[in-house]
A protein has these predicted regions:
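N-terminal leader segment of winged-helix/HTH proteins
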Residues: 1-50, 154
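Charged, amphipathic alpha-helical coiled-coil/dimerization segments
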Residues: 6, 10-11, 40, 68, ...
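Pre-recognition alpha-helix immediately N-terminal to the DNA-recognition helix
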Residues: 27, 31, 38, 42, ...
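Short amphipathic alpha-helical elements of helix-turn-helix/winged-helix folds
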Residues: 62-66, 151, 158
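Helix-turn-helix DNA-binding elements, focusing on the entry/boundary residues of the two helices
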Residues: 71
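The alpha-helix within a helix-turn-helix
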Residues: 75
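Helix-turn-helix DNA-binding motif, specifically the short coil turn and the N-cap/start of the second
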Residues: 81-84
Length: 159
């Protein structure tokens, strides 16, 4: 989007002119946030049938790939504030999807594991996540998903 404008049409009498974004239309942070909101809304709707939120999906995935991981390590891995994480893991534990055990290495911290029910739910969620990713890939066009992943990884410093 450039700063130049094409000639604007005058709105019909009594109809307000459409609002414009101005410099926000070229602002990376603004557009990343809008894209994140759109993607999370779709993913949230996708996971709703499992009564699972995107953040819970991320936590279950992290635990599944790192059995016995500590709460602190999951917080660091996913960028979750510890007070927020406690509520997430409390909910997952109450639903019988994850469990905490005292860490063998440091009894002051908890190790996290998925239960059998948690593994089953996560597999269903992964299937839905793949459908969600396919929808996004179609919107981005051939090669668009991979290009976007590479660019976002540069920004997020996760390469």
């Amino acid at each position: 989007m450039s700063a130049e404008r094409s000639p604007a049409r005058k709105p019909a009498a009594g109809v307000p002119a459409p609002a414009e974004l101005g410099l926000l239309g070229d602002d990376l942070g603004y557009l990343l946030r809008r894209a994140q909101l759109a993607v999370f809304a779709d993913f949230g709707e996708t996971l709703a049938e499992l009564q699972l939120r995107p953040g819970q999906f991320a936590v279950l995935t992290a635990i599944d790939h790192n059995p016995g991981v500590t709460q602190s390590d999951v917080c660091q891995l996913l960028g979750i504030q510890r007070p927020n994480f406690v509520a997430v893991i409390d909910d997952l534990e109450a639903r019988g999807l994850a469990r905490r055990t005292s860490s063998a290495a440091d009894r002051r911290s908890n190790s996290l594991l998925l239960t059998a029910a948690g593994k089953r739910l996560l597999q269903r969620a992964v299937d839905l996540q793949r459908e969600h990713e396919s929808r996004l890939a179609r919107r981005l066009g051939p090669g668009g998903r991979q290009t976007l992943l590479e660019l976002l990884s540069r920004i997020a410093n996760t390469e």
